[in-house]
């Protein structure tokens, strides 16, 4: 019953967006679902059982079904708050594949205070592109003067064009002050990135990491 309600709700939202002619390019099922979604039925914790995994994936697939039916051209994205944590990313994605939960884009959150180092992020993203051959989006990060270029350069450097993009959380909060005035310094960084990467001959800033990613255990 819960799965059907999730399916119906997701379908209604997708239909409304389509009718308003604002159909999204990406449909994300849940938010940072490495801890599950729709608690308690879809909750995951460190001691998750097979039943916990099954319950979560059935809920995810209900949303997936609605998205595919209404907006077949849109891409499905699953988001995990595991930016630099390779072992946990692989475990989750392998579970999704095993349980026939679909994803067209690998979505990850990355906050440097929680999700390991920039080098861990880079190594993880390179490993995931090699293993799963899917586009990757860092679809949540806290933009500041120190990390905007770092994170965007890492994603942009992924091989075979698999760096799908980045999304700052929450743009109206980080890019503007309480009076609504734009932060010129942050906008300047994004302007420079646009000019850097709009060129067809732009080269990646980072070289692939020279590590054995099979041994990464975060």
Feature-to-residue mapping (PLM):
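Active-site cleft segment of glycoside hydrolase catalytic domains centered on the general acid/base Glu
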Residues: 1-103, 114-126, 131, 145-153, ...
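Conserved, mostly hydrophobic/aromatic
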Residues: 27, 106, 166
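Substrate-binding cleft of secreted/luminal carbohydrate-active enzymes
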Residues: 110-113, 134-218
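Short, conserved beta-strand edge motifs with alternating hydrophobic and charged residues
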Residues: 77-80, 105-109, 137-140
């Amino acid at each position: 019953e819960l799965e059907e309600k999730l399916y119906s709700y997701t379908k209604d939202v997708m239909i409304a967006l389509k009718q308003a002619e604002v159909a999204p390019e990406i449909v994300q099922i849940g938010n940072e679902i490495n801890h599950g979604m729709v608690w308690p039925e879809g909750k995951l914790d460190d001691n998750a059982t097979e039943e916990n995994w099954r319950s979560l994936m059935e809920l995810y697939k209900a949303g997936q079904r609605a998205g595919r039916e209404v907006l077949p051209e849109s891409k499905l994205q699953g988001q995990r708050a595991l930016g630099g944590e390779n072992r946990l990313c692989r475990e989750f994605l392998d579970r999704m594949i095993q349980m026939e939960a679909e994803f067209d884009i690998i979505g990850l959150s990355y906050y440097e205070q929680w999700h390991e180092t920039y080098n861990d992020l880079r190594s993880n993203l390179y490993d995931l592109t090699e293993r799963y051959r899917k586009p990757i989006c860092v679809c949540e990060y806290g933009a500041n003067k120190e990390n905007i270029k770092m994170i965007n350069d890492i994603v942009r450097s992924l091989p075979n064009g698999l760096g799908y993009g980045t999304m700052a959380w929450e743009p109206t909060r980080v890019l503007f002050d309480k009076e609504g005035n734009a932060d010129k310094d942050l906008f300047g960084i994004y302007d420079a990135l646009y000019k850097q990467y709009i060129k067809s001959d732009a080269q990646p800033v980072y070289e692939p990491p020279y590590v054995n990613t099979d041994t990464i255990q975060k």
